[in-house]
């Protein structure tokens, strides 16, 4: 499994759980489970950070990002105070877009595609087992767009 796919999968699972809880969708519970409406309901929960299905194969060729009209490279974003500690982010390779001849065309712009994800941040810092949920904006790829042209009259 590629680093990007592994991080994406674990964050998608975490986001799904948070969405279910926030939406108030009932998940079957044992009769002894506390009610979330109870003011004594804990604000802290225990989470198993082991990722299921780590061996899921990647489904794209390794040169995928280089074949776009707006190619990118992946850069490692590492933060030991965050889970996942490594997030791979895209960086656009050109300011323009690549035409059919493989040349950069500056009549189009290569721009980053960003996605907000949820990560777990250690809190307080350096505590191995204490985290809080945090939103992070990451660049997941690049795309080609027409430039914004402003005419001065």
From Swiss-Prot:
Keyword flag Glycoprotein:
yes
Q: Which regions span the lipid bilayer? A: none
Describe tissue expression: Highly expressed in adult heart, skin, and intestinal tissues, such as jejunum and ileum.
Q: Which cysteines are joined by disulfide bonds?
A: 92-142, 97-144
Q: Which GO terms describe its biological process?
A: adaptive immune response; inflammatory response; innate immune response
Q: Which region is the signal sequence?
A: 1-23
Sorted keywords for this record are: Adaptive immunity, Cytokine, Disulfide bond, Glycoprotein, Immunity, Inflammatory response, Innate immunity, Secreted, Signal
Q: Name one GO cellular component term.
A: extracellular space
Molecular function as annotated in GO: cytokine activity
The entry describes its oligomerization and partners as:
Homodimer. Forms complexes with IL17RA and IL17RC receptors with 2:1 binding stoichiometry: two receptor chains for one interleukin molecule. IL17A homodimer preferentially drives the formation of IL17RA-IL17RC heterodimeric receptor complex. IL17A homodimer adopts an asymmetrical ternary structure with one IL17RA molecule, allowing for high affinity interactions of one IL17A monomer with one IL17RA molecule (via D1 and D2 domains), while disfavoring binding of a second IL17RA molecule on the other IL17A monomer. Heterodimer with IL17F.
Q: What does this protein do?
A: Effector cytokine of innate and adaptive immune system involved in antimicrobial host defense and maintenance of tissue integrity. Signals via IL17RA-IL17RC heterodimeric receptor complex, triggering homotypic interaction of IL17RA and IL17RC chains with TRAF3IP2 adapter. This leads to downstream TRAF6-mediated activation of NF-kappa-B and MAPkinase pathways ultimately resulting in transcriptional activation of cytokines, chemokines, antimicrobial peptides and matrix metalloproteinases, with potential strong immune inflammation.
* Similarity field: Belongs to the IL-17 family.
* UniProt protein name: Interleukin-17A
Protein's organism: Sus scrofa
């Amino acid at each position: 499994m590629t680093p990007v796919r592994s991080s994406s999968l674990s964050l998608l699972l975490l986001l799904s759980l948070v969405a279910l809880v926030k939406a108030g969708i009932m998940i079957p519970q044992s009769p002894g489970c506390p009610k979330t409406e109870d003011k004594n309901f804990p604000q802290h929960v225990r989470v198993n950070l082991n990722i299921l299905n780590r061996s899921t194969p990647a489904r794209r060729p390794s040169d995928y990002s280089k074949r776009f009209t707006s190619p990118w490279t992946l850069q490692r974003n590492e933060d030991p105070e965050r889970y996942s500690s490594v997030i791979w982010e895209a960086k656009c390779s050109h300011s323009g877009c690549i035409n059919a001849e493989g040349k950069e065309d500056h009549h189009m712009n290569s721009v980053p595609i960003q996605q907000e994800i949820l990560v777990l941040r250690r809190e307080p810092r350096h505590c191995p087992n204490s985290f809080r949920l945090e939103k992070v904006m990451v660049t997941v790829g690049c795309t080609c767009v027409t430039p914004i042209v402003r005419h001065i009259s």
